[in-house]
Design a protein with these regions (language model features):
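Short, basic/glycine-rich phosphate-binding loops at helix/coil junctions
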Residues: 68-82, 130, 225-235
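ATP-dependent small-molecule kinase catalytic core of the GHMP/sugar-kinase superfamily
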Residues: 22-27, 35-37, 41-51, 140-264, ...
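ATP-binding N-lobe of GHMP and related small-molecule kinases
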Residues: 19-118, 136, 140-145, 172, ...
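Glycine/serine-rich anion-binding loops at beta->alpha junctions
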Residues: 109-138, 156, 263-278
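Short, small-residue-biased leader/transition segments that mark boundaries at the very start
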Residues: 1-7
Length: 316
């Protein structure tokens, strides 16, 4: 149908603006959690979550090329990032290439700009871009859904990173429901110079001790009503109190953003990154200057949200 052709064309155009001779360049975008709740621990040790994921315009870049020599050669701009099977990009590319018996090889150049171990799904997003890139480079013909089914084997956040936009994630993060795009707003990112592992975040979380859980349903309602202020007021992360107790700097960044005009500032994922939502670009720019001056955050980045449909609201 014409509608599905348009959709297919949008899928193809989402990431891949540049296709030079034999080179494909992909943007792997970061995510923030507008709301994050943990419902409990499952028999298998994983936690049951409910969270609202949102893509933002902050990205790593993957340049991929076919090579005559079989195998995968991955290089990165950061010396401490592994370039073998331990890297999710390598894992994703290898998984598809083995499944489809790809004869040629692949060279992947990964340039990281999303902070590492920051609760922004940088690694998962890189893997998502690798899935999309390999699928197109070798004309494997997989649909977005088929890529997402495979992606969950690489990591719980990877299917979402293929889908992008605004979504509710449930289960261990793999059950995804697309949501209407959020109202236009600006996002300030502040990451202190500390790393918090997801494991630490869960260890600091006393499930019985959570008085009031984040209002995820209220948050979804605000997004559906296209009400930025109602959305911001309901943004909450269940991990935040425990992590701030351990790392007060996260609370300081949050307070500074809110003093400087953020509608709300919240920790993303398992931290330590904080994001503030603003209704005005100039206010955000001023807050970014204050945050840089304060020395609280090692990474300060001012951006906005990424909507899948290129800013055209169509609530399917």
């Amino acid at each position: 149908s014409a509608a599905s052709d348009v959709y297919k064309r949008q899928c193809i155009n989402t990431v891949y603006k540049v296709q030079m001779e034999g080179l494909m360049r992909l943007k792997a975008m970061a995510k923030i959690n507008l709301g994050l709740d943990v419902l409990g621990k499952r028999e298998d040790g994983y936690h049951e979550v409910r969270m609202i994921m949102q893509t933002i315009r902050m990205y790593d870049i993957l340049d991929i090329r076919k090579t005559r020599r079989p195998g995968i050669v991955l290089t990165t701009n950061l010396p401490f990032i592994p370039t073998d099977q331990r890297n999710l990009v390598y894992k994703a590319a290898q998984m598809l290439m083995e499944e489809f018996d790809v004869e040629e090889g692949l060279s992947i150049k990964l340039r990281k700009f999303i902070p590492v171990a920051a609760g922004m799904a940088g690694g998962s997003s890189d893997a998502a871009a690798a899935f999309v890139g390999v699928n197109r480079m070798f004309h494997l013909g997989l649909t977005e859904e088929q890529l997402m089914e495979r992606a969950v084997k690489v990591g719980a956040d990877v299917p979402y990173c293929i889908m992008r936009g605004t979504a509710l994630a449930e289960g261990i993060g793999e059950k995804l429901t697309r949501l209407p795009e959020v109202p236009k707003c600006y996002v300030l990112i502040g990451k202190p110079g500390i790393n918090v592992s997801t494991k630490t975040a869960y260890e600091n979380l006393n499930l019985e001790g959570i008085g009031k859980h984040p209002d995820i349903d209220g948050l979804i309602g605000a997004i559906r009503n296209n009400d930025l202020y109602a959305m911001a007021s309901r943004m909450e992360n269940v991990f935040e109190p425990g992590i701030i107790r351990q790392y007060p700097v996260i609370g300081n960044i949050k307070n500074l953003m809110e003093e400087k005009g953020a509608l709300k500032a919240v920790m993303s994922g398992s931290g330590p990154t904080v994001f503030g939502i603003f209704d005005n670009r100039d206010k955000m720019a001023a807050a970014a200057r204050s945050l840089r001056k304060s020395g609280l955050a090692k990474t300060v980045f001012a951006t906005d949200i990424y909507n899948r449909d290129g800013g055209v609201t169509n609530d399917k």
